[in-house]
A protein has these predicted regions:
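N-terminal hydrophobic/helix-forming segments and targeting peptides
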Residues: 1-429
Length: 429
């Protein structure tokens, strides 16, 4: 197993929610000597040092202070911390047919069929009043199977394999617990969450839960797949794979240059939030680095960004869903994503830069253009380019089953991407 895939799988298993992903990224940054900034104005940057800032516990920006002037330009890599999931509603508990169920919302464009018959757990952030009467929040993760969404037996729906649609309001409520016939005790989710907080945090006993941001996830760990272990199967490859690759590149980057990694939340639902790509987080940090609004404009004019998000690999059973000349293949290298209608931010000059960078790095490079008769997804790339004016290139790793509960990528591609992003930071081209 390559070290690249090994560490990525560890990160994926740790990152059961965007909150946990940012926590895992921050821990790796601190271990590497990066300093967390609480208030931007209170810090004097030291050349060669690393810094990071978080927002809402679900977005993070990390950067290296180079030895040159930041107004000469930064190399920026952007990714996102969120993935499609089933999010627990505020008043979710339902008791019927002898079981306790949770009502859920669909977050983002989730592929729903694969969520059935999986061992599911629960993770996220819980807000509560502590013993001193203060409002506080903590991350929790049950890290064991506590829920499941059983399929309807084919005997009760003979057309299931031909024509079964899913109603997200009624069909995907997970079972959480059983109820005995004479059970008069109300199931209390707040008590369950309070007990989980107490079990994870010694200083948080006897808390009163007020609210939560929780989502379900598949308990199965990331794993290598194939006779030759050439594939990686996991939840949340879109887009934690890119967050991890950006982090690895930043840690390996030369401190001679200014380099920055931004991992935003809320990409899967449009990025229009205070911590999404459409929010002020990146522009605020860039102005802090530059020292003034005027200097920030010069910095942004001289900077280049890679928006790194997964690309659709050709599915061998559905190869007609791709343009025949622009179909990425697993383990054949990262993918430059192009859309002339600006669903991706890549220009001809940006694509040329990536071709030269890949050539000098010895990394194979592929290109993706969606079929002309199909709609095209988007990324944080066009949004960040529009908000900042920074030249942006959309890049990604070929992936199958995108937005499923479990996605598939190539192990060789993971190493290719790490090398390419490190070379980007180091100005190889």
């Amino acid at each position: 197993m390559s070290q690249h895939c090994d560490d990525l799988m560890t990160f994926l298993n740790e990152s059961s929610s965007p909150f946990h992903a940012v926590s895992a990224l921050a821990a790796r940054l601190q271990k590497a000597g990066f300093t967390q900034i609480k208030q931007l104005d209170d810090v004097v940057l030291s050349p060669g040092s690393g810094y990071f800032v978080t927002a809402n516990d679900s977005s993070i920006i990390a950067f290296r202070a180079g030895h040159g002037q930041p107004t000469d330009g930064l190399r920026i890599i952007g990714a996102h911390t969120d993935s499609p999931n089933l999010s627990v509603k505020p008043n979710p508990v339902k008791k019927r047919s002898g079981v306790v169920q949770l009502a859920v919302d669909v977050y983002g464009g989730a592929l729903l069929n694969p969520w059935f018959d999986r061992d599911l757990s629960l993770a996220g952030r819980v807000s509560f009043v502590d013993q001193s009467g203060q409002l506080a929040s903590r991350l929790i993760d049950f890290r064991r199977p506590i829920a499941i969404i059983p399929s309807l037996a084919i005997h009760l729906d003979r057309d299931a394999n031909k024509n079964r649609s899913i109603n997200p309001q009624t069909d995907i409520l997970p079972i959480l617990a059983g109820l005995s016939e004479d059970d008069a005790t109300d199931f209390d989710l707040s008590v369950l969450l309070a007990n989980q907080i107490s079990s994870e945090y010694e200083d948080c006993s006897d808390v009163r839960v007020l609210d939560f941001e929780l989502s379900l996830y598949d308990c199965q760990d990331a794993s290598l797949v194939g006779l030759d272990n050439s594939f990686l199967a996991s939840a949340r490859l879109d887009n934690l794979l890119s967050c991890h690759a950006g982090l690895q590149a930043l840690l390996a980057a030369s401190d001679a240059y200014w380099s920055l990694l931004v991992c935003n939340d809320h990409e899967e639902v449009g990025s229009a939030s205070s911590v999404g790509a459409q929010g002020p987080m990146l522009t605020d940090v860039l102005e802090f680095i530059a020292g003034s609004a005027a200097a920030s404009r010069k910095l942004r004019d001289q900077s280049t960004m890679l928006s790194v998000d997964n690309a659709h690999a050709v599915h061998p059973n559905f190869s007609d869903r791709h343009d025949e000349s622009h179909g990425p293949i697993l383990n054949r290298g990262p993918v430059v994503k192009i859309n002339r209608n600006q669903r991706y931010a890549t220009s001809g000059e940006g694509s040329a830069l990536m071709r030269l960078l890949a050539e000098r790095t010895g990394v194979p490079l592929q290109h993706f253009v969606v079929r002309t008769d199909l709609g095209c997804g988007s990324t944080i790339g066009p949004i960040t380019a529009a908000e900042t004016g920074i030249r942006t290139i959309d890049l990604g790793l070929p992936t199958l089953a995108m937005h499923s509960i479990r996605e598939l990528a190539g192990c060789a591609d993971v190493e290719y991407l790490d090398r390419l992003l490190t070379a980007f930071y180091n100005r190889v081209a």
